[in-house]
């Protein structure tokens, strides 16, 4: 059974509480890059729907090997190590040990699950090896109900089935002694000039799904973070959790996050259409209304009428909740089915 988590980021306001109260999400993955841990923990304690079981802290240690200018609030978290090198990992430098101890010590007893710090992986090299080593160390020495290995993997690595099989073999060899294994998977997509940010080539997608499927067969619990509409496919594979946020960059992790760049642009109001299995600009819906039955595009969300009747009647926040609501409705339908064949049949019926 798959559950939807809110992928936390900047400008959270009341978005998380509202989504939880409306039963459109079942927990949160919190970002230490965007908010201090004490503030996050206070927020969890004040929010009735958040518990040690459904609240996850993403250490975002994968930023540690990049320029310190991109770390934002991470510098204030548990003596976060900046600009980590291979030598730091090889020699087990004091700053690494101090950080891991501070991070786990704070979470232990407060949270059921730990997202074990991991590095950003773009090849089968030292970053992958040390991600496995960190996970083993935490599993052997820390006390949590569930352990999730944080793996931020470049989408380029999913071009090769052989690379994926090698990664799976190494994971299996290094974790088969443990119970309660899990993976917190983030796909790091290349920056692209394609205006359709959901775009992904079929081979890459196929190998990502294969990777997740094989981990599930090995009894790993799976969280896939920063998902967009592809989260429906992960739900069909019975991933335990999928994470998705309120901005596009909280729904798709791209390589731009590891660069000091300013991104500007006019934000457009977009509606998540289940029948289209895509987003559509409200301006486009308005233009289509003259020669197409736009009711066929609706996802049966609470804001449908206001969104479709007048573009000015609906806010960006309304549409953020519309996305989670529609996604949650779809996931709930998938959860009620047993076989992948039934789930495929359901999906085809939604878009036919």
Predicted regions and their residues:
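C-terminal helical cap(s) of enzyme catalytic domains, especially alpha/beta-barrels
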Residues: 254-276, 343-352
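C-terminal amphipathic alpha-helical segment
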Residues: 262-306
